Structure formats: C-alpha cells, structure tokens
Amino acid sequence: MARMGGRRHLKTLAAPKFWPVRQRAGIFTVKPSPGPHPIERSIPLLILVRDVLGYAKTAREARKLIAEGHFKIDGRVRRNYKYPVGFMDVIEIVDTGEFYRVLPYPTRFFTLHPISKEEAQFKLGRIEDKSTVKGGHIQLHLHDGRNVLIRVSDPTNPVEAKPYKTLGTVKISIPEQQLLGYAPLEVGSLVIIFGGRNVGRVGRIVSIQPGMRRRGIVTIEDARGEKIQTSLEYVFVIAPPNEEPWISLPEGAWK
C-alpha cells in the first residue's frame, strides 16, 4: 500500500505548548508548511499575525493581510499564511515600519523583540553542517535552511573556509546573504540557550565537555555570575570572545 504522506491538519491539543492558541478556539489549528524551521521550534505566520501581534481577530482577516503582502520575513514578503517563523528570523510590518527579531525567552519559549531598522538589515545563522560543491567551493548549511557559499581559490587548500566550524555562527545581510562576520563556538563566546529548561538564558561559555556528536555539555556563566549547564545542541553563539552581543536582547537578559 502506498504511503499517504504527512497529515495536512494539526489538532489544537497537539500544537506546541508555546503557541498562543486555546482549545476553545477550535479542534484544529494551522499546521506550518515545510520550511526553514521544524514545527517544534516555529510558529505559523497566521498565528503570529493574529494571536501574537494582534493585527487580526480571525483567521480569515489574518490570511487576507498576509496575502496582501503586509509582512516581511528576513527582508522578503511572505504570502503563505502557513510559513514557519523561527528563532533569529527578522519580521517587518511593512505599513508601520516596525521590526522584530524572534528570540528564545524564558517560560514563554520565544518572544518578538523590537529592533531598529539598522539591526533589521542582518541576521545570525548557526552553522549546522558544511559540504563541498562543484568547483571545490565550500557551502555552509545554516539552522534556518539557508546555504551560504564560501568561494575558495585553491580547492586542495581551502584556507578561506577553514575558520568556519560547525555550531559556530555567521552574521549575514538579508536578503542578500552577504557574510558580515563569524563567531566560533569556543570558551569565552557569548551564547543564548534556545532549548531545554534554561531556554532564553544568556552567558559566556566557561567550559565545553565533549560528547557523542552534539551531546556534549556546555557550562555558561550569566551576567550575575550564576553557572548553567546545558546540551551543546541548545546553544547559539551571539558574539565571539571579548565582544558584546551582535544583536540587541530583551531587558535583563545580559548586562
């Protein structure tokens, strides 16, 4: 028997707990379409517009606003109301000139942090993997599905790509995807935790205990001197050692 593929519908009770939807709103809710972020770390654009930003009272109103192109994600108009919005994405309200960055946040799991127009010109991407493409150039695969090409002059000795390591962070312009900077995952780097019970905490790496694949343990120290341990999988570098965060953070998250 042929497989039917994934389900097109999502029951409200099965939705991630951080989605601001209630059971009384209906049996079913919006299921994100396949895209840059997994369902457990994203929220559909419709729910963001209606329930988080409050620009619509009903799903029909939200779909209409989205279809008319009033919202940009990472510098591009998105008209798919199921589009998954996730960590580090930059949201622009075209008509009002407001900008937000999606950040991890304690208890609520995520927050829309207001940012300036200047800061909205770039985003951070965690390097999940690297590969060699035609011509010997190196391609970086980021956490949001983007691919950034590093051109090398000598494929046998790709010195241009050697600084870029897995789980490090690149700073790129949006939507052009020009490389603006790189922050490695190492002792002294400033990170934000985007998973587990310490989600939203910010601190500098004190030590990294290696483990199988990404199951290592990272110890970070926050601004109050408190030490926190979390999985290597949950840390996102937001600045290299001896530098302040590349992005603005919610009040109280850092110094």
From Swiss-Prot:
Domain of life: Archaea
Cysteines joined through disulfide linkages: none
Record flagged with keyword Cytoplasm: no
GO BP annotations, alphabetical order: translation
GO MF annotation list: rRNA binding; structural constituent of ribosome
Keywords: Ribonucleoprotein, Ribosomal protein, RNA-binding, rRNA-binding
Segments forming domain S4 RNA-binding: 43-115
GO CC terms: cytosolic small ribosomal subunit
Cited SUPFAM superfamilies: Alpha-L RNA-binding motif
SMART domains attached to this UniProt entry: S4 (SM00363)
Cited InterPro entries: Rib_uL2_dom2, Ribosomal_eS4, Ribosomal_eS4_central_region, Ribosomal_eS4_central_sf, Ribosomal_eS4_KOW, Ribosomal_eS4_N, S4_RNA-bd, S4_RNA-bd_sf
Stored HAMAP family: Ribosomal_eS4 (MF_00485)
Assigned protein family: Belongs to the eukaryotic ribosomal protein eS4 family.
Protein name: Small ribosomal subunit protein eS4
Organism (species): Hyperthermus butylicus (strain DSM 5456 / JCM 9403 / PLM1-5)
